[in-house]
Amino acid sequence: MASFAASQTCFLTTNPTCLKPNSPQKSSTFLPFSAPLSSSSSFPGCGLVHVASNKKNRASFVVTNAVRELEGYVTKAQSFRFAIVVARFNEFVTRRLMEGALDTFKKYSVNEDIDVVWVPGAYELGVTAQALGKSGKYHAIVCLGAVVKGDTSHYDAVVNSASSGVLSAGLNSGVPCVFGVLTCDNMDQAINRAGGKAGNKGAESALTAIEMASLFEHHLKA
């Protein structure tokens, strides 16, 4: 009988023992190649051993109570209060972002509980959002701005500082702070993302704020 190669694979059901061709064990049963295989392990001198598992014993977290899915909703936002921090730099663009955010809030019945705070530029978004968050008046804060790339490295410094500032504001205040700052190569890209053919980043940020406010209020509230 031809000898097995050193890397010959053994298929077992119960006893993970390498079966030799010249001394077969009648008590062991080979699994057909079509049998379901759910796990594998290695044994010395036996190569890769596949062990079949009973489907009935497989834990399914999808159909048990072991896993809960938590998420925010945008259907009921009447009770939430929001703040919008808007950078005045590139106001032609940022005002459109603000209008998109306000329109979205109105669509979801957030009509009066909105404060709009203007700051000089994207640098000032983070510290302002943090102060608003710590005031305890708001369920979420939207930060809007537009940074257009120029010929110097100033663009990278502003973008990095603005993004990290808004992130820190949310972490330090415990209130969701949404980053709605456009970072574009040119003004045309910014305009297209402020109500043009690429949508409105302000509207998207407002929707994110509603969902996050709902998530924190209904699931993550201390």
Curated annotation (Swiss-Prot):
The reaction(s) this protein catalyses: (2S)-2-hydroxy-3-oxobutyl phosphate + 5-amino-6-(D-ribitylamino)uracil = 6,7-dimethyl-8-(1-D-ribityl)lumazine + phosphate + 2 H2O + H(+)
A cellular component term, taken from the record's GO annotations: cytoplasm
Residues annotated as binding (2S)-2-hydroxy-3-oxobutyl phosphate: D151, T152, R193
One Pfam family of this chain: DMRL_synthase
Main location: plastid
EC numbers, comma separated: 2.5.1.78
A GO term for molecular function: 6,7-dimethyl-8-ribityllumazine synthase activity
Pathway membership: Cofactor biosynthesis; riboflavin biosynthesis; riboflavin from 2-hydroxy-3-oxobutyl phosphate and 5-amino-6-(D-ribitylamino)uracil: step 1/2
Enzyme class: transferase
SUPFAM superfamilies per the UniProt record, alphabetical: Lumazine synthase (SSF52121)
Localization in the cell: Plastid, Chloroplast
Transit peptide: 1-66
Matches recorded under InterPro entries: DMRL_synthase_chloroplast (IPR017420), LS (IPR034964), LS/RS (IPR002180), LS/RS_sf (IPR036467)
One GO BP: riboflavin biosynthetic process
Subunit structure and binding partners: Oligomer forming an icosahedral capsid.
Assigned protein family: Belongs to the DMRL synthase family.
Protein name (Swiss-Prot/TrEMBL): 6,7-dimethyl-8-ribityllumazine synthase, chloroplastic
